[in-house]
From Swiss-Prot:
Keywords: Activator, Nucleus, Transcription, Transcription regulation. Residues 154-173 have a biased composition (Basic and acidic residues). The keyword Signal does not apply. Coiled coil: none annotated. Residues 142-152 have a biased composition (Polar residues). This is Mediator of RNA polymerase II transcription subunit 11. It is found in: Nucleus. It comes from the Eukaryota. GO terms for molecular function: transcription coregulator activity. It comes from Debaryomyces hansenii (strain ATCC 36239 / CBS 767 / BCRC 21394 / JCM 1990 / NBRC 0083 / IGC 2968).
Amino acid sequence: MSIEKESTNNFVQERLDSLYEIDCKIVSLLDNMSSLFQTYSTPKSSDNDLTEQKDQMKAQTKNIYNAISNVAIGLRKEVKIMDENIGVYNKNKDGIMILPISVDQKNTTLGTKKLNDEIKELNTIVTGEETDGAMNDTNMEATTKQETNINNEDSEKEKQENITAIETKKESSENEDEDFDMIA
């Protein structure tokens, strides 16, 4: 039993070690960013200092981009390893299977509605029209009621069309029954 635990811990430990290395790279990235800002904010008095500062900024920027690249590559590798091991147990040497998780879809229409409301509000601010907040709410309620009425009318029309179609089918089947009776 302890051999199985050791093999289980190997795969898990490898993943943890890899994520730790990525975490260290992120810390290094943040350190490089802070040193870049420090170099940028330090005033230089002579032209020699300015060229030195430019060289430092180039080197630090290069370090930042290298760190970002290394972090992105490391995360992609980890995601790939995780994806390969979801739902199967024979993809890694330790026979570990990662169970799939279900991710529920969030309500994305709410964000769109809020965005549209914000855009309307910004348009009123930009155009300089003063509108009362209660007036906007009343207009919004009226628009919502109109949309609801339109939806109800559409559903009523669909119901009527369905009823008509059913009645037509009944009539045609009754006519077929009469024709069958006449033949018999």
